[in-house]
Amino acid sequence: MATAVVGDDVYGEDPTVNLLEKRLASLLGKEEGVFFPSGTQSNLSAVMAHCGRGEEIIVGKNYHVYWDEASGASVLAGISLWPVETENDGSISPSTVEGAIKEDDPHHASSRLLCLENTVGGKAISLKKMQDVSETARKNNLSIHLDGARFFNAVTALRCKPEELANCADSVSICLSKGLGTPLGLSLIHI
């Protein structure tokens, strides 16, 4: 580490961070990646990129974004979270998404984002289920964010290519310390 070439990553001057961001984006078939020190920061940035104040996220009631991130989307960004039931494997069914969607109406928050997670509670959600719920979200003009803290665990369990799972979402948070053993860090990958 003492001999590593470093720079100010805020100004894009750290070649190691730049390479990491580009490598992860390429691996997932996405255009860009941004390094964050934590998953909460990465997920919050994604949520704020997809939603405006007064809009809403549809999210599994047991997902990290709803349960463990200190209501950051609501507190810092003015974005509502609409928690929905998940299946036994942690997935959200397409019919659950359709039932939760709110149209533009001045009386309530409009649904703008479906937040998914894979793995959930150590269970990898099948690629087919991820694709089906993503298709439903896209048909209903929802953006999709995947909290992939254990993304590579899911890819390994599903025996799929990283790009296949990443294609189920518009943005993906990938934790580098869970499953890969880095000291810290997350990368937000966006199309």
Please place each PLM-identified region on the residue numbering:
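Conserved active-site segment immediately N-terminal to the catalytic lysine
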Residues: 161-177
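Conserved N-terminal alpha-helix of the aminotransferase class I/II PLP-enzyme fold
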Residues: 1-39, 61-62, 66-67, 72
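PLP-dependent aminotransferase-class I/II
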Residues: 78-119, 124-132
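Conserved PLP-anchoring active-site segment centered on the Schiff-base-forming lysine
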Residues: 49-67
